[in-house]
């Protein structure tokens, strides 16, 4: 039994040098070798010989690099659908013995621009191998989607889908007249789902806070004094009326009541209660609970500086000093 000849019976023009790698992929190298053969077929060893004869970069490579590019050639022949293996006797099925021919598939061969193997056109195989119909070039987007996936077969696509506004499906058509409004209300009443926007869900999900201040610390307001027929307006009453007309510092609490409570309450208690009342269930991440008790004394003292001053902690309201 003689070994198959690996001599190439045609002339090969050398290209490149042994330093620069040729700008071709392994698929292009295989296609170049098979296309140069008169019979348009080659064995694996003949493909090796063609690549070595044409490109000194692969011929002059060391043993490790030579084994690497030869393995890549074998992998591309076995895994790429562009190439098929034929037996030497011409049968359709190739045997497991060495010396089989490799040739390109006529309907699935790699396409190149006028023999320029540097710029390879990748032929997309579509979805035909997955069990669906292949995509055909058509102007109707609906036809393309119906051929790609069976899920879109039952959908009715508009004819002008390519020129439509992409956000048109997400826009609500408001009625332009009283007649359109009446027709829209009839359609909404007949259907199970209404297109109107219900804002009550936000009211229930996000309740509006009435106050950030614990009103338990505020002293109850005094009952109004009984005024005689001859009303004498003292100076204190005038000041009180001015305070009443002022804008409350805290929502829900009048200015007079708030200022009166400040004079009767320890500022440190108000400051601590504000932190505790703000970090409620409604605002769990508003403030962290205090690490230490606010009634403790500082370990370091500074002349002319009071740590009980609320302005040191970022509060704008200046509370009067405790007596």
From Swiss-Prot:
Q: Which Gene3D superfamilies match?
A: Winged helix-like DNA-binding domain superfamily/Winged helix DNA-binding domain (1.10.10.10)
Chief place where the protein resides = nucleus
State the compartments where it is located. Nucleus
User: What molecular function does GO assign, one term?
Assistant: sequence-specific DNA binding
GO terms of biological process kind: anatomical structure morphogenesis; cell differentiation; gonad development; male germ-line sex determination; male gonad development; regulation of transcription by RNA polymerase II
Q: Which SUPFAM superfamilies match?
A: Winged helix' DNA-binding domain
- The organism's superkingdom is given as Eukaryota
What GO cellular component is one of the record's annotations?
nucleus
Q: Which residues cross the membrane?
A: none
Pfam families on file: Forkhead
Keywords, in A-Z order: DNA-binding, Nucleus
Q: Which residues bind DNA?
A: 21-122
Physiological role = Probable transcription factor. Binds to the DNA sequence motif 5'-[TA]TGTT[TG]T[TG][ATG]TT-3'. Regulates sexual dimorphism in the gonad, promoting male gonadal cell fates in chromosomally (XO) male animals, yet plays a role in gonadogenesis in both sexes; probably acts downstream of terminal regulator of sex determination tra-1, to control early gonadogenesis. Positively modulates expression of homeobox protein egl-5, probably acting indirectly, during early gonadal development.
Q: Which PANTHER family match?
A: FORK HEAD DOMAIN-CONTAINING PROTEIN L1-RELATED, FORKHEAD BOX PROTEIN
- Its recorded name reads Forkhead transcription factor fkh-6
């Amino acid at each position: 039994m003689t070994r198959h000849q690996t001599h190439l019976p045609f002339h090969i023009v050398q290209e490149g040098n042994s330093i620069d790698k040729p700008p071709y992929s392994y698929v292009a190298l295989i296609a170049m070798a098979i296309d140069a053969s008169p019979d348009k077929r080659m064995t694996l060893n003949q493909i090796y010989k063609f690549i070595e004869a044409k490109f000194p970069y692969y011929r002059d490579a060391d043993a490790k690099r030579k084994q690497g590019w030869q393995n890549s050639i074998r992998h591309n022949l076995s895994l790429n659908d562009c190439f098929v293996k034929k037996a030497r006797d011409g049968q359709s099925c190739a045997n497991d013995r060495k010396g089989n021919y490799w040739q390109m598939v006529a309907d699935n061969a790699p396409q190149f621009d006028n023999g320029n193997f540097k710029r390879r056109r990748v032929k997309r195989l579509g979805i035909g191998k997955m069990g669906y119909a292949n995509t055909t070039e058509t102007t109707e987007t609906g036809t393309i989607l119906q051929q790609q996936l069976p899920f879109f077969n039952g959908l009715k696509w508009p004819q002008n889908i390519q020129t439509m506004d992409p956000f048109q499906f997400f826009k609500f058509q408001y009625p332009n007249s009283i007649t359109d409004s009446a027709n829209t209300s009839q359609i909404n009443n007949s259907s199970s789902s209404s297109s109107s926007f219900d804002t009550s869900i936000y009211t229930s999900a996000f309740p509006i806070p009435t106050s950030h201040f614990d009103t338990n610390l505020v002293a109850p307001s005094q009952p109004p004094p009984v005024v005689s027929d001859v009303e004498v307006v003292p100076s204190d009453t005038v000041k009180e009326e001015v305070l009443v007309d002022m804008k409350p510092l805290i929502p829900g609490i009048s200015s007079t009541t708030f200022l009166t409570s400040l004079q009767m309450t320890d500022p440190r208690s108000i400051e601590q209660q504000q932190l505790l009342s703000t970090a409620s269930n409604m605002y769990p991440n508003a403030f962290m609970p205090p690490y230490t008790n606010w009634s403790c004394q500082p370990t370091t003292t500074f002349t002319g500086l009071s740590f009980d001053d609320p302005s040191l902690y970022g509060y704008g309201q200046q509370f009067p000093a405790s007596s």
